[in-house]
Amino acid sequence: MSSSRPANSSSNPGRANQNARVVLTTLDAKIHADFEESGNSFDYSSSVRVTSAVGENSSIQSNKLTTAYLHHIQKGKLIQPVGCLLAVDEKSFKIMAYSENAPEMLTMVSHAVPSVGEHPVLGIGTDVRTIFTAPSAAALQKAVGFTDINLLNPILVHCKTSGKPFYAIAHRVTGSLIIDFEPVKPYEVPMTAAGALQSYKLASKAVNRLQALPGGSMERLCDTMVQEVFELTGYDRVMAYKFHDDDHGEVTAEVTKPGLEPYFGLHYPATDVPQAARFLFLKNKVRMICDCRANSAPVLQDEKLPFELTLCGSTLRAPHSCHLQYMENMNSIASLVMAVVINDSDEVVESSDRNSVKSKKLWGLVVCHNTSPRFVPFPLRYACEFLAQVFAIHVSKELELENQIVEKNILRTQTLLCDLLMRDAPLGIVSQSPNMMDLVKCDGAALLYKNKVYRLGATPSDYQLRDIVSWLTEYHTDSTGLSTDSLYDAGYPGALALGDVVCGMAVVKITSHDMLFWFRSHAAGHIRWGGAKAEPDENHDGRKMHPRSSFKAFLEVVKTRSTTWKEFEMDAIHSLQLILRKALSVEKAVAAQGDEIRSNTDVIHTKLNDLKIEGIQELEAVTSEMVRLIETATVPIFAVDADEIVNGWNTKIAELTGLPVDQAMGKHLLTLVEDSSVGTVVFLLALALQGKEEQGIPFEFKTYGSREDSVPITVVVNACATRGLHDNVVGVCFVAQDVTSQKTIMDKFTRIQGDYKAIVQNPNPLIPPIFGTDEFGWCSEWNQAMTELSGWRREDVMNKMLLGEIFGIQTSCCHLKSKEAFVNLGVVLNNALTGQISEKICFSFFATDGKYVECLLCASKKLHGEGTVTGIFCFLQLASQELQQALHIQRLTEQTAMKRLKTLSYLRRQAKNPLCGINFVREKLEEIGMGEEQTKLFRTSVHCQRHVNKILDDTDLDSIIDGYLDLEMSEFRLHDVYVASRSQVSMRSNGKAIQVVDNFSEEMMSETLYGDSLRLQKVLADFMSVCVNLTPVGGHLGISVTLTEDNLGQSVQLVHLEFRITHTGAGVPEEAVSQMFGSDSETSEEGISLLISRKLVKLMNGDVHYLREAGKSTFIITVELAAASKRES
């Protein structure tokens, strides 16, 4: 199937996105060139429209233009005058380039600070260390020795001549070290130590607000983010921008000071944020413009340098003139922008490293505007960057939730497809409800079948539709269909004549002459701006660059386009295409399908039975292994039922608490825990019984017997819901870790005020892995247990930055798996440093030997004797080998159950389609004359097919077992039900040479009754099947039926049926009989079948009994039905 735009191709989304961005970069270059050439006469709106058209329809003659544009972006030599810049050779510390304002800012003499000797001169070749005080020079020299110098930003330095403080922000580029110097304002308390933790403190309140938000609402998340940034930074306006799939943007949240025009709901063209700028946002997560009206300072470079310096990574890099003009037009004099970067689900970069690296994607921006010049110090900008990273993690989680909703929509669509197929194919999809418009979101749909057009909703006229078919036949001959969001861009000549009603189209061919169409109107019709009500032209010149002009230009660009067709929508359309093709081909070959009815049914039965046997056997094996592990485990394991009564208590938990197993069983769990833990346990049980499983929750048990005088037992538990056979929660199982000794040590740490080294460095195996930092984030503790766990010696890590150097994602000692893990670690450390109670979190890293260590991390503040915070202690809790094995078995069990569930769900859905085909063939065969014997066989086949359908529909076994199933009542002949049931065991009974004897009168079997015939048929077939399986070769099977009538007044006549199925042999095992009567919790394949059948019989006001006699056994099945003849009278 073809697509008119590469960006819409579903075959390779990553490659398509890349191609689209190349096109957009060309458009960006053209607009930039137009602006530079036109100056004040630049017409923004028309430029966007013209370049959009040219970019997509003309040959690329602008390679030179694009190259020049990108060179201009990367090699610009201007900075903002709020600070200055130096480029330094790392080996000699000599200056290679400097901004024109650097000498004045860094070497100007201050009369308030006395100086001795000659004043340093700043120029090409000057040693940068001579400009600053000795401690500052030493700090710069130390920073150069770091592999990742960004970890040390900002570096506080003081000028030698003036004594003025500056923040030095350094980064490496090819051939030099670029250092931005930003003055520390007089009102600002300078940050005396570098490191992320110092900056993270500034954003702690905002981070906590985001962390506390419940999931499920992207709107609430964005609103909270802009509000927190608004309060944190003090800008006049804060907005959240989201980039859509076609790269156009939308303001999804906004907070402003009173009196400012709102921009909420604004959409703007993709070219408003150029692709080059987006690329830079992936590298530099925060961008500040202090004053768009200030004159930029040029950077002077050593003419002897063999290369050009790039300032892309500079915090002071000057904005481009086009952007400055845009800012001034909207009266935004200063801005601060934070990038929201997430993993790109469409692109994965393969790596030979221990991890594959997912490429990053710019989801959107958080943008701050101010109506007057504004400077934000680097520490606060660093805090904003951290906040944006936390926000990005939550955005990713919300997107995952949205993807789950999409998956549910796909399941809904698959159900709808089966429903559509049950109709008169293919006309039923347009003549009945639901119809083909319900399959995907659209404004209209049409079916071209046998040269006749059937239309639904907003569609082209019959003449226009046939014109589209002619165009498809001429230009897309080899394609089975086409999807486009713009018929105009796809090259359809009559697109403009269709107007706004039809812009996008998806079409598929059923046959060479029959087609399905879906249509969408223009995207602008669905877009509303939530800003001020005034028309753009009333207040603004549409030619100028302004948000309203952007919105107007965007509407102009998308007026011939619809919303794009999602990949899952096209999958649904393709599925319907394939199903209809099959249905139409079946119609042409009805005669050849007669024998296929029985074979398809047998195949489905065989697959279901094989799957059921395999799944139950595998689950039984895993269950047995789990029971053995629990009984012999050296970790505490206990369990409760749905009433919170203890029904599991292994040896280890009995040993720890002093409460024997026999005394613990039957007690309420809340009576066994300390009063201080009751609230925690109640909350934990409530979640677990709802199926919401929690991990790493601490609480305390009381002690009994010989341990009654001991301290309470502290455990950390993982709670997992115990589920019954039908996936209902029947209890909770707790796998625990005894942390009493660890808690004792931690309590001792919080009380200690002197020398703690004797505890931390103690090689006792009871001491857990411990590491710590000072208040600035430098590693100050690393005990022996941590050395053994990580492979890094104490002397290797001491005085290194914990975030970045020790735990990081690039050149760190202990490699973390993802940026998200790094940000989460920063959040935990920040919470501990600010004195907040932090719960244990899952923490993982790679040791030196490549082993992946998984553990729980608990961070707590370290206090000085006077109570001041001096750093952080971190404790790691490792799962024992037995617990790890138990958790591994648990994961395997869950994976096996999920695999079986998915397979059964898939098989159920797939079985529907051939059954629908069989149903279609049956209807055609009914139109063909058949003999009497053929008719009897045909009717038996029909009943068996309906039986299979009913089995596939009866997936809610809980309703059957609990007696809530609604029976489907209809008239039927007892003979038909019996023959259909008997036919299902005939092949097996013949194969075992079993003599089957029927004992009933033909007159009785011809009775017409009223009840649920299919479920009665299922019951009889199940009991007959069990008997045939247990009857030995050459054995005997007798089936007798008796019928008695009971008059209830004149209008109702009840019929009592009794079936006796007698078989020779050993009989049904006692376990299966117990399972049939529900007295055994364990359920085998045979047992569940008997249990469900007995429950169905109970719904028919009957029951099942099983009698054992010498050499034979009998099932006695009684049901109560109504006589159809009396009912009619």
From Swiss-Prot:
Q: Which residues form the GAF domain?
A: 217-399
The record's keywords, sorted A to Z, are: Chromophore, Photoreceptor protein, Receptor, Repeat, Sensory transduction, Transcription, Transcription regulation
- Domain (Histidine kinase) spans 906-1123
Q: Name one GO biological process term.
A: red, far-red light phototransduction
Write down the Pfam families for this protein, in alphabetical order: GAF, HATPase_c, PAS, PAS_2, PHY
Top-level lineage group:
Eukaryota
User: Keyword Lipid biosynthesis, does the record have it?
Assistant: no
Under the heading InterPro entries, the entry gives:
GAF, GAF-like_dom_sf, HATPase_C_sf, His_kinase_dom, PAS, PAS-like_dom_sf, PAS_2, PAS_fold
Domain named PAS: residues: 622-692, 755-826
Q: Which residues bind phytochromobilin?
A: 322
> Record keywords: Oxidoreductase included?
no
**What does the record give under GO molecular function?**
photoreceptor activity; protein homodimerization activity
Please list every transmembrane segment annotated in the UniProt record, as residue ranges. Answer: none
Give the CDD domains listed for this entry: HATPase_Phy-like (cd16932), PAS (cd00130)
Q: What's noted about post-translational modification?
A: Contains one covalently linked phytochromobilin chromophore.
- Function of this protein? Regulatory photoreceptor which exists in two forms that are reversibly interconvertible by light: the Pr form that absorbs maximally in the red region of the spectrum and the Pfr form that absorbs maximally in the far-red region. Photoconversion of Pr to Pfr induces an array of morphogenic responses, whereas reconversion of Pfr to Pr cancels the induction of those responses. Pfr controls the expression of a number of nuclear genes including those encoding the small subunit of ribulose-bisphosphate carboxylase, chlorophyll A/B binding protein, protochlorophyllide reductase, rRNA, etc.
Subunit structure, as described in the record: Homodimer.
User: Which protein family is it in?
Assistant: Belongs to the phytochrome family.
- The protein depicted here goes by the name Phytochrome A
